[in-house]
Structures are given as structure tokens and as C-alpha cells.
């Protein structure tokens, strides 16, 4: 039960929040509503930034997925481009979380440099523009439902590289 409560609280915290100043209007001010909305990652994808990316080490220009949304049994083509503002060295890591509804399937810390070999890159990564492409064969048997993925990435000094999330990626059962 505690597990489900924690997962629900996390989802509530990650969801876009909409609060109006009028709901806190003690002094009858005419302030306009405060809107805290997630910022989408440019391109054909379901990705959003977890928070304001302006101070991140990675400036993502665009991420394209094909097909979007991903389909079971199909090859997912990923093309991404961006600019690294600093060198990324060994010791960088990713905090990865994958959920199926409210159920956490994966919660792990992964070595970023070990993961980069999957997209034919390796550490150290120098500052500057970069583009990566990757083909991923998705299994035919993905349980139908809504999935949420979040990847929070840090350099070896704990500085924020980027944080991305994909909410409610839905796989439908065969009809």
C-alpha cells in the first residue's frame, strides 16, 4: 500500500500543475492565472522536459521518433540532435524509471558512458553539436496499457545534463 501511495504522489508531482492566483485571492487582486506547464521537447515525439532545461548541459534541438507513437513488433527509428555545453566524462549517470500505470517496472541508476555504446558513441564526449540515430526493434508482445518513462541525466560532478519524461505512452492490445 505504501508503494502505491508513493507512486501516486510521484505522478501527481510530475503532472502539469495548473493553479490560479484567483484561488488564493485574499486581497481581491486582478492577477492573471499562474500556469506551470511542461515544456515539450521539439520534434515528432511524446517527450517533455522534467523541468526548465535552460541551465542543462545538453541543449536538445530536436528528437524525432518514427513511428510516433511506437508500435509493438515494429522498428522504432530515433533521430536526435543537440549541443553539449561541456565535456561529458566517465562517471556520468542516468536515473531511469519506467512505470506501467502506477506500477514501477524499472528504477535504476545506469552508467551513461556504458549506455552510449548502444548508440555508437563513447566517453568522453566533447562539447559541440551532435546527432545520433538509432533503430530499436520493439517486441510484438508488449502488454497493453499506459507506460511512463523518465530519464534524469547527470555528469560525474552531479551537474544536470538533462531530464526527459514521456507520459502515458499507450500500447493497445490486438483487436
Swiss-Prot record:
Pfam families (alphabetical): E1_DerP2_DerF2 (PF02221)
Leader peptide range in chain numbering: 1-21
GO biological process: intracellular sterol transport
Classification via SMART domains: ML
pH dependence comment: Optimum pH is 4-7.
GO molecular function: phosphatidylcholine binding; phosphatidylinositol binding; phosphatidylserine binding; sterol binding
Domain of life: Eukaryota
Keywords linked to the UniProt accession: Cytoplasm, Cytoplasmic vesicle, Golgi apparatus, Lipid transport, Signal, Transport
Gene Ontology terms: cellular component: cytoplasmic vesicle; fungal-type vacuole lumen; Golgi apparatus
Subcellular location field: Cytoplasm; Cytoplasmic vesicle; Golgi apparatus
Biophysicochemical property: temperature dependence: Optimum temperature is 25-30 degrees Celsius.
InterPro entries hit by this protein: Ig_E-set, ML_dom, ML_PG-PI_TP, NPC2-like
Propeptide segment residues: 22-37
Subunit and interaction comment: Monomer.
Similarity annotation: Belongs to the NPC2 family.
Its job: Catalyzes the intermembrane transfer of phosphatidylglycerol and phosphatidylinositol.
Stated name of the protein: Phosphatidylglycerol/phosphatidylinositol transfer protein
Organism: Aspergillus oryzae (strain ATCC 42149 / RIB 40) (Yellow koji mold)
Amino acid at each position: 500500500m505504501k508503494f502505491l501511495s508513493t507512486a501516486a504522489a510521484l505522478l501527481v508531482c510530475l503532472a502539469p500543475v495548473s493553479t490560479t492566483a484567483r484561488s488564493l485571492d485574499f486581497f481581491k487582486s486582478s492577477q492573471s492565472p499562474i500556469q506551470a506547464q511542461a515544456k515539450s521537447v521539439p520534434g515528432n515525439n511524446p517527450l517533455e522536459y522534467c523541468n526548465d532545461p535552460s541551465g542543462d548541459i545538453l541543449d536538445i534541438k530536436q528528437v524525432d521518433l518514427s513511428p510516433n507513437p511506437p508500435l509493438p513488433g515494429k522498428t522504432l527509428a530515433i533521430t536526435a540532435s543537440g549541443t553539449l555545453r561541456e565535456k561529458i566524462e566517465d562517471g556520468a549517470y542516468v536515473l531511469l524509471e519506467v512505470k506501467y500505470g502506477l506500477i514501477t517496472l524499472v528504477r535504476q541508476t545506469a552508467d551513461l558512458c556504458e549506455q552510449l555504446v548502444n548508440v555508437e558513441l563513447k566517453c568522453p564526449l566533447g562539447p559541440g553539436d551532435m546527432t545520433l540515430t538509432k533503430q530499436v526493434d520493439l517486441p510484438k508482445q508488449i502488454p497493453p496499457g499506459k507506460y511512463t518513462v523518465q530519464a534524469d541525466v547527470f555528469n560525474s560532478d552531479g551537474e544536470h545534463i538533462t531530464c526527459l519524461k514521456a507520459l502515458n505512452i499507450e500500447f493497445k492490445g490486438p483487436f
